[in-house]
Curated annotation (Swiss-Prot):
Molecular functions (GO terms): antiporter activity; NADH dehydrogenase (ubiquinone) activity
Superkingdom of origin: Bacteria
Keywords attached to this entry: Antiport, Cell membrane, Ion transport, Membrane, Transmembrane, Transmembrane helix, Transport
Any one Pfam family match given in the protein's UniProt record, by short name: Proton_antipo_M
Protein name as annotated: Putative antiporter subunit mnhD2
Family, as annotated: Belongs to the CPA3 antiporters (TC 2.A.63) subunit D family.
Compartments reported by the entry: Cell membrane
Gene that this polypeptide is encoded by: mnhD2
Topology within the bilayer: Multi-pass membrane protein
Amino acid sequence: MLMSNLLILPLLLPAVCALGLVFIRTHSRLSRIFSIGTMAVTTVVSLLLLIYVMYHKPIALDFGGWQAPFGIQFVGDSLSLLLVTTSSFVVTLIMAYGFGRTEKRAIRYYLPSFILFLTVGVIGSFLTADLFNIYVMFEVMLLASFVLITLGQSVEQLRAAIIYVVLNILGSWLLLLGVGLLYKLTGTLNFTLVAQRLNEMDDKSSIVIVSMVFLIAFSAKAALVLFMWLPKAYAVLNTELAALFAALMTKVGAYALIRFFTLIFDEHSGITHPLLVFLSCITMLIGAFGVLAYRDIKKIAAYQVILSIGFIILGLGTNTIAGVNGAIFYLANDIVVKTLLFFIIGSLVYITGLRQYKSLYGLAKQEPFFGVAFVVMILAIGGVPPFSGFPGKVFIFKGAIENGNYIGLALMIITSLIAMFSLFRIFFVMYLGNENKGEAIVFNKIPTYRKNLIGVLVAMIIVMGLAAPLLFKVTDNATHLNMDDGLYEKMVNPHLIKGDK
């Protein structure tokens, strides 16, 4: 009972903090300290819950004492708590990164609150175990993210916000339509009972149609092929928000695809999963063309986000234990790596005041620290051992071979090399290029605490790579829980297995 009640804390702590910041919004320093402390505590609580789940069983919290399927239910399993812990960790660093900001009062006053509201939506999406509440949490994210995109009130931000909101609202409508159709088919919203009843149904065509609705809805959220909103939105954000969006927004969509297409729509993998592989291949190609086509380092970073979604969904599409295992590992890894990517890119823009990488020379002497961090980040993105991108890609590689997805496998290898090439191209110009070739650049000094935060992420990437066997115990537990027939139902809601009550 105690552990079940503690499951609400990762959601409750940032929610209460976000509301509390409204009353102390004019005290910028106090607001930052309060929000950073809250997210640090949230990270610790989430990690303790994850450790408990690994040694015991998933935690289920029935709100108001109403047992599933009648009440709202949160479930903390190894998949959700791994992502909650990782997300809370990077949000803590993101809040700390913006500690010394000096923008207009409106931005300083309200930025921390809406970052926390967005975090509430993200964590709620990971923890909720019913269809309608995942829609609600997606809407919380959408509203908070819309405010964050438009907070500076520049023309570029408003233009990017229009594209972002239109596509995400369409995705939300499709998600709500899918929830309604699935409720009509099964008569319930609870994940456990939905999965059980779909497996018992004979009308397979209706299930496939509904699964396609969810696939399109979550693809819009994850930037799986439907990527149009992402590059412009990320390019207009400051470093803090760009890192937040890159780390979390698309990852929630990827999580939803993994959860739904392993647990709920697993019986129709002959149709849905080859389509997932196809979409992942298209997404990898889009990302690869994007990172090669642009010279703006913020847009190159944005297309790196799209490219990584292709890798994750390829693992899911293989419909193998190894592939899904790798997808979950790479998903958690990518939350950390993309935070580091945007921290570094944002810091380089701050130092030089420029975004076109061909104009940047002479950083090797000015900021050698960023050169080291940049190389570690590139190797992690490329999947080079011993860094954190390697283990996940190896298992996705294995899953693709087991399933015979050789085209997807080849594309993953080629686009990984392209991703590394596009970033090494920036590195060679910035750090090894002739500093007398371009115009003279006035370098700004970056605060030491921001370098320290980048150092923490670099260390985290190395630790995740070296601790891969330990992390794979978590991801393997998550994979089997969602893919093994009846295991999720038995572990989370055993009272529903023998019939509805």
